[in-house]
């Protein structure tokens, strides 16, 4: 995710796999580099790549990764029901498993518009599949969201920065409808790009 992390990885790579370097013509430094994030050290990344390329005489590749779509889209869902099972769980018309796989497979908890660090009302967000673990942010160990006011059936829940996985890695698990893709223009106009229906399943 960061240039300093890449530097650490490359040092370990050189130490453990240095014997293979003379046979290499190129190296892929992978994806996941958040180069479009405001606090990303782009200058350090450039130095790392130049130094490696010049030292070993190899071509260096970076995969585009989610930086291409960083902060470019959100996932809008609605509360279908609210149940209590030791904790309040808002059941959504979206699914962590089918629409936000990074929130199930990785220690990642997406931000939700309107959440409040000191809010009095705490919820977990459950998906609309039959999967027991279809809970947003469960793998991150922080699956609870706080709000200043109670959620109600029909309320919208907007997950920030979700386009990078919601569009490219979603599934129709359990026959769950894929999210529609809309474009929000700078003037506020909303344009339907693709509406997905049961035929897609």
Task: Please place each PLM-identified region on the residue numbering.
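Active-site loop/helix belt of alpha/beta enzymes
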Residues: 1-84, 174
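Charged (often Lys/Glu-rich) extended helix/loop segments that serve as interaction or gating elements
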Residues: 48, 59-201
């Amino acid at each position: 995710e960061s240039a300093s992390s890449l530097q650490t990885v490359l040092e370990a790579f050189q130490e453990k796999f240095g014997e293979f370097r003379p046979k290499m013509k190129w190296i892929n430094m992978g994806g996941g580099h958040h180069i479009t994030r405001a606090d990303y050290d782009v200058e350090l990344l450039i130095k790392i790549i130049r130094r490696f390329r010049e030292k070993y005489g190899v071509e260096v590749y970076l995969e585009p990764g989610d930086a291409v779509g960083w902060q470019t889209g959100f996932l809008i869902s609605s509360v279908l029901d609210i149940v209590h099972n030791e904790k309040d769980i808002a059941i959504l018309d979206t699914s962590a498993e089918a629409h936000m796989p990074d929130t199930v497979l990785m220690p990642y908890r997406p931000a939700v518009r309107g959440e409040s660090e000191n809010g009095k009302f705490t919820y977990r967000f459950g998906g609309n599949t039959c999967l027991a673990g279809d809970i947003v942010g469960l793998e991150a160990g922080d699956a609870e969201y706080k709000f200043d006011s109670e959620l109600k059936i029909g309320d919208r829940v907007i997950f920030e920065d979700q386009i990078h996985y919601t569009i490219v890695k979603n599934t129709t698990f359990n026959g769950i409808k894929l999210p529609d893709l809309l474009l929000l223009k700078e003037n506020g106009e909303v344009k339907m790009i693709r509406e997905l229906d049961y035929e897609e399943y």
